[in-house]
Amino acid sequence: MDSSAGKSKSGFVENRSIDFIPENERHGSIFAQFTLWFGANLQITAIVTGALAVVLGGDVFWSIIGLFIGQCFGAAVMALHAAQGPKLGLPQMISSRVQFGVYGACIPIILVCLMYIGFTATGEVLAGKAIAHLAQVSNTTGILIYACFIIIFAAIGYRLIHWVGKVASVIGLIAFVIILTQILALSNISELLAVRHFSWSSFLLAVSLSASWQISFGPYVADYSRYLPTKTSSTRVFWAVGLGSLIGSQISMMLGVFIAQVSNGGFVGNEVQYVVGMNPIALVITFLYFSIAFGKVTLSTLNAYGSFMCIATIWNSFKPSAQISKLTRLTIVLAMVIISTFIAVVGEHTFLSAFKSFILFLLTFFIPWSAINLVDYYFISKGLCCTNLSVKA
């Protein structure tokens, strides 16, 4: 357990870990929830996810429709998880002890850790390429530089993560306008949308890609709403998180669909270079490389922070009296980033095929977990608050 009870909420570096957040330390706003998830989804991996719908056989029109349907379903699910945060005041996965028990919850938590590592590794591949071009270094060096930023941001914690989310929202919007403008200059969008060859397999793949993208946030979305005051409206949290994630990811995935269609195969294997190379202006190219790297930092930091929460929860299951210090946080984050960095370096050249398999695997696991958690919370426990749920369960 963390021994930081009673510490001031004013510090920028987070003191707490998996313990309950008391009312006098609650802070934050509904708008910050929107900007965090909006910014976290305006990034290159979401663009690649959208592009997969076309790369794997879909057309522009039905891919966009399928992606949007999946977004709506998935965002609703993840937003229902987010609404638990202010009421429980605990990280998302520790609440799984209600459904699975103290030791049983370790099984889904371990799988969530694998998800964090996988998503961080894919982010490092793409952001590492962007940093490599900015700094004129090798891709491997770019990945290592990016990994250092993840470690620093995740070690500092909650407040910095929300600040990064706000900045990423602004940078991501500017990058979106630039890329969309270039797409409009290179092709006729109405002509792209007019080519339609519907097939159930391609359509359902698009739905699955976006739904699994959104649902994969479920295991840690409440980690970033748990500091909100207990009386915060669950409905407002639901809409802020859900709309932020839905709008941000749909923008990115729609861009991915258009880019994959106009690239004539040039996007595959050259995702970062192709997106940036669509614009001929050197200053704009530099900004786009920066926006790709910074946009990925938000989500990768969420993953590293979430991995700390999960591993601390497992540790607490077997050693309830153990102290979780800032050094422990740093050590856990460092270990997770080292593993993901190794995977990123080794798997850099097989990125797209591995990413497709990875994101669809998430769907097969997280839908059952999410269904169990939500049914229990909203229909059986009926919004169980933390006064009835100790960290020791």
Language model region names:
Residues 66-100, 107-115, 298:
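Juxtamembrane transmembrane-helix boundary signature
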Residues 1-60, 202-208, 226-236:
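Membrane-interface "cap" regions at the ends of multi-pass membrane proteins
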Residues 105-136, 293-314:
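Hydrophobic transmembrane alpha-helices that form the core helical bundles
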Residues 43-46, 69-77, 112-121, 171-182, ...:
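Selective recognition of specific alpha-helical transmembrane segments in multi-pass small-molecule
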